[in-house]
Structure formats: structure tokens, C-alpha cells
């Protein structure tokens, strides 16, 4: 009876979540007989960091409470983040060995493996921890351009074309996210999230609120700013709430006591998800409008295209930020998605956009596109990962492209999609 119930549960999950494949990276023997893994290109978000600003900043003034005593300096990778990333590296080690891409304890030559991180401490450290789990005896070099911490142009999601025509089209596309009410509509959709985060902050009890320095979150004060050679930015309630959302998410992962993480409030998982929604929306607004995405992601798209087309390469690990994954996804036309088992629904901490190159017995090359991430429970519990206890895997769909019966895109189609995104940048006036 238990076995039948389990099978029925799996069937139900397949029907309700057709895009979710819990074991996408572990293939059947029939699949393995048909395809061989040739290469992986991974774009990773750094793992858990401390907030960029906390006590003493605007973020600190928003609440009468003290934020967590972090195990790292501001914006740097925490001890927990290092452990979690090592576990993810160990999982990819087990999987690539199982698929025959590498042998156990393999030491690659300089052309086979490329680990490249943005020159921010949290990115370099994430790549270092990943490499320790992935190839523990290989002493892999982490490539980064500058002494920490400085943004590398490859990973810097900045506007490099900023004409009036660009700004007009960008704002048109951003406003469409909010329907007929535009930016106001985007903020209206966050009404519940704003209410919850204000309550958890006990914002009205803060000295800054009582002095009028901090105000209630409203729906009509968001302003988007585009400046040449700078990241898209904003002013207003959404920006202010995002800084608190970011800090709460990190504090929830870092602090074992969920009530302590919520400053003594008992929150449901749904309420934590609504807090995280603010950050998800903030990222969407700034980085996923199509014309903005192809603008800010252009250098990274070119680099990833080159890696996918380097014959000697077997494994590429690029470590950047949530804005990198969000903009690359949008530029490539990834269909809208919402991740299960995570309070962050788009680009969870430590998540990885994975392009898998497979070659069939006839020599034809295919690509699978997945988002690999640790569930909220796995992050909080620091669960060990292996082939029997895998991270979450979500199959991403590319608009207008057709997968074969095995869920793979033709390599030509994926290459062409990269080229379309690169040409779209050239077409910005």
C-alpha cells in the first residue's frame, strides 16, 4: 500500500509540476546508452554572504532590533556559505564522475577546466569552496581579474548603451510588468509583502521612523535610473524594502532559530516567501526587461557562447550574482518560472544556471538547460549532497525552441539563441 501511495504521489507531482524534474541530472541507462556528456557551462550565483549594509546604515535604522552577528564582513561569504558551496561542488563531482565526464580524483589540464569568478570576495570565495568539493586533489586555479573587491566588466551588469531611445523602450517594457498601472501596479502587487516586512522589522518602533527619516512603503514613489556604465538602479519604496528583504533572507538561512531570524515573530513559510518576493521583483524590474537584459548581460553572453564553443573545454564554472543569472535568462528568452521548495523563486542563493552539452551516438550535439539549487531546507539544514540526496533541479524552457523526446535542445538552436541575444545588443541605438 505504501509503495502504491508513493507511486501515486510521484504521478501527481509530475502532473502538477511538469517542468520540475527532481532527478534531471541522473539519467536512465537508456539515456546513458544514447548520449554522452561532453561539457558543462555553469553560471553560478555566489553562496550566502553577509548583508552589504546593516547596523548603522539605513537598513539598521529601519528596525529597533539588531541584525545577526555575521561570520563575515559586510558583503563577504559567510562560513555557512562556504560549507554549502563545498557540498554543491561535491555533488557535481559525484555526478560528472557518474556520467563519465571525469574520472575520480582526476587532475585536468589547463584547457579542460575553467573556473572564473567576478573579483568580489564572495564570488572568488564561492568558486574556491566549489573547487575544493569538485576536484579536491586538483588544486584548481580560480581565475579573477582584480584584487578583491572590484567588479569585473564580464560580470558587471552595467548599461553600456544609454540613448533616449533605449531608455524609452526599457521603461515601456518595465511598465508592462505592472500591467495597466505600470510601476504602481508592480508595487501594488507587493502590498502583502510590504505589510509583512514592516511588521517583522517593527519599523514603526524604530527611532528613524518616529523622526520621519523612514517612511511607510507606498506604491507610487519608485523611480528607475539608467546611467551610462552603471547598473540599472532605483529610488523609492521598492529599493528600501529590497534591502530589508535581502537581509532577512540571508538571516533566515544563516540563523538556525527561525523566530530569532524574524526578530521574535513567528512566520509561516508562505510569509517568508512573501518577504523574499520583494527581492525577486526588484531583480526582475531592474534586469529582466528584454532590452535591458541584452544590454547588461552582453559581455557575459559572449563569454558563455565562447566557452560552449571551445572544443578543448570540459567544464566551465563562472561565479557572479543573481543579476547575472536573471539578465542572461531574460536575454536568452527563458520562459517565466517559479521555483518550488525555495522561498526565492527565481535565483536562490548559490543557484546555478547549467548548460549541459550531450553528444548522441551519431555525433549530433544537444543541450539541456537547468537551474540547480539547494532547497530552503537544504540551505538551513546544510544537508549533505550526493546522487541519492541531490539538490533541486528545474528544467528551463527557451521560448520558441523545441526540445526532443529526451528534453534536449539542438546545439545549433541554442547557439543561434545566443547569437540572437548578442545581435540584439548591436541593434540598440
Predicted regions and their residues:
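Bacterial N-terminal signal peptides
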Residues: 8-18
